Amino acid sequence: MAKSKSRGRRAEKKSKKEESSLVHDSEVPVQESGENSTPSGVPNTFFGLVDSNELDYFKQAESTLNINAFDSDEDRQGFINSVLEEAQGKELKLVTNQICSKLMERLILFANNKQLKKIFKQFSNHFVSLAFHKYSSHVLETLLVRSAALIEKELAQTEEEKHEEEEEGEDEKDDVPMEDLFISMLNEFKPHLTTMIDHSYASHVLRLLLLILAGKELPSTTTSNSTLRSKKSKIARKMIEIKDNEDFNRAFQTPESFKNELREYCQTISAGLDTKSARELSIHKIGSPVLQLLVQFEGLVDRERTFWHLIFCKDSEGKDSTEESFVEYLLSDSVGSHFLESIIKNDGARPKYLERLYKLYMKDRVLKLAKRSTNGVYIIQALLFKLKPVEVEFILDEIIPELSELISIAENQNLDLANKLIDASIIRGNYRRDEIIDQLFKKFAPNYNVENPQDHTTTEFIENILQLQGSTLGNTRDDWPTAEERKRALFLEKLMEYDYKFVICTWFNFMALPIERFIQMCFHGVFCHVVEKALIVEPEESKKVQILRKRLLNIFQGQIVGLACNSYGSHIVDTLWNFTVLLPMYKDRIASELFSESHKVKESTYGRLVWKNWGMELFSRKKYDWKALIKQQEVEYYGEDNEESTTSKRVKKPIELKLERLAEEKRRKEEQAEKAQSGYIKRKLDELTGSGPEKKQKLRGRNRN
């Protein structure tokens, strides 16, 4: 009731009085109010407003470039030339305007080398102001990436290419190498570096400068894990449909002078920091990513590792109470834990530095940190791949027995921890592999009998991991699969790759699902990959598993054509070709389904691909050749060229053993008959020629006489 009373006439009169007082108070020059609204040390240059008529023209130009409906690259370049001519002398006004800044960014992306240098020169002496501005900072980032690409191109030029360019640009007497222009810009920023670190817009420019100077990969401005832009900026960039060109997502060759510039940048920034301010920056939402890069790159130019020792004590020192409380804050804070994780993962520190922090402040409470699912657990995951083997095994010994308790299905916690444990175990020669498998089954399928699976197995395994209830599975509103569903599906695929027991368990769960529900999974954009990854066959397959494989294939009966004509299901039908190895009857059944509705299959884009991959032309015209493909597949599957070695790799079927017995008996009888026939013929010849053994003895006897 108190809130409703405050909305009466008295409140209105009071608000009017406050507004009038604000009006009187604000009757000061605009320039002064602008200066007072910005922090000290932050430039706030006003470059003017874009005229309304010009604004309409530039709006239209921006939409034309966005649509990109030019007949050729020459037409587009001609349009860009005309827009740049119109924008000449107005570049600074345009980049600080919300709409026109998008146009300038597109022009920079499409500009040739000469145009790029021209724009760069127009920004000269104003780079600092542009870096601190909301809109121009984004334009500046794009310009820096294109400039880095041009510097690499100029470094790679031969003398002949340079001479040709000089002849082409004889009219341009003041043509300066891009490297010199870039260094001139770097000098502009040096007095403002400490202010840039924690500024909302300038910090992103500083990050990019550090990446270029260090010769590291320049990340995309739209990907979710980009170190270049903030989350809001990446979303906005996608909405305005500005796409990066080929200069992004790659590293560039840099000149030797850049190493000196990086050293000066590091020295300038470190000179303005002490331990207290450095630690404050490491947990600062905006400054922390910049400090991460400084710690990561300082090793290129500073053997003393100044930034590291500003934040942490020297490696020769023991436990320090102040440092201990700071590390504890890092381990419990979201920004701080991300900072610590980043410098561990990105080789930002020497191994002995990390080992010191681990032994002093983390080793005796590994399990407790692993239970902090929003911060501490990420540090443990990073340490699994950076510490010595002995320490890694110690962490595994601590966590593996409690793995089932650490994973939370409902809250979707620590799936990444299970992933990293599996990877660390594999690297260490499958260290405690069986225990990891037992813990995962204990968590996700507690009622499943791993050694002797039963027909009454429920769907608990895939339900606990994929959370099918409440997912987008079966939705008719064309809902996109969520990021959580992708994460869960990838985790299940990882388990199936890790051990075949998870594949068998997944088969039983598929068979326990209603057929309609299973087919919905095959049509789902994420869960279809789970089905596809589950359709694998072991080389040495037992009879029991082969029977289970046949039972799983029965689910697909009558569904093949629908799957083949679907963008997701078609991949599953393709996978069934290998999944039906040694099961020619099932392979023939699937091919017959496709052939029975050949017109429908051939009318579909995806169906035609399935038709080709299954060799259906041979099936319909030359079935003998199609069966030869099946035989060839069996030989290739076992990786042997002869039937003897192939059959010795697996348990032979009773019919195969019987056929071999009959063949052996037939061969033995033929040999006996052949011997008998040859003996009979030989005796007859001896009788006719009189050259038997007895006559030879008589002759020998007569000769002696």
From Swiss-Prot:
Q: What is its main location?
A: nucleus
The record's keywords, sorted A to Z, are:
Nucleus, Repeat, Ribosome biogenesis, rRNA processing
Q: Where is the composition biased (Polar residues)?
A: 33-43
* A Gene Ontology BP annotation from the UniProt entry: endonucleolytic cleavage in ITS1 to separate SSU-rRNA from 5.8S rRNA and LSU-rRNA from tricistronic rRNA transcript (SSU-rRNA, 5.8S rRNA, LSU-rRNA)
Q: Does the keyword Nucleus apply?
A: yes
- A Pfam family reported for this protein in Swiss-Prot or TrEMBL: PUF_NOP9
* Residue ranges of the region described as Disordered: 1-43, 665-705
Q: Where is the composition biased (Basic and acidic residues)?
A: 15-27, 665-674
Compositional bias segments (type: Basic residues): 1-14
SMART domains, from UniProt?
Pumilio (SM00025)
Q: Which domain of life is it from?
A: Eukaryota
* Gene Ontology CC terms, in alphabetical order: 90S preribosome; nucleolus; preribosome, small subunit precursor; small-subunit processome
InterPro entries registered for this protein in UniProt: ARM-like (IPR011989), ARM-type_fold (IPR016024), NOP9 (IPR040000), Pumilio_RNA-bd_rpt (IPR001313)
Give GO terms: molecular function aspect only.
RNA binding
> Where is it located?
Nucleus, Nucleolus
Q: Where are the Pumilio repeats?
A: 86-121, 122-157, 188-224, 272-308, 321-359, 361-397, 512-549, 554-592
Q: What does this protein do?
A: RNA-binding nucleolar protein required for pre-rRNA processing. Involved in production of 18S rRNA and assembly of small ribosomal subunit.
Q: Which family does it belong to?
A: Belongs to the NOP9 family.
UniProt xrefs under PANTHER family: NUCLEOLAR PROTEIN 9
The protein's name in its UniProt record: Nucleolar protein 9
State the gene name recorded for this protein.
NOP9
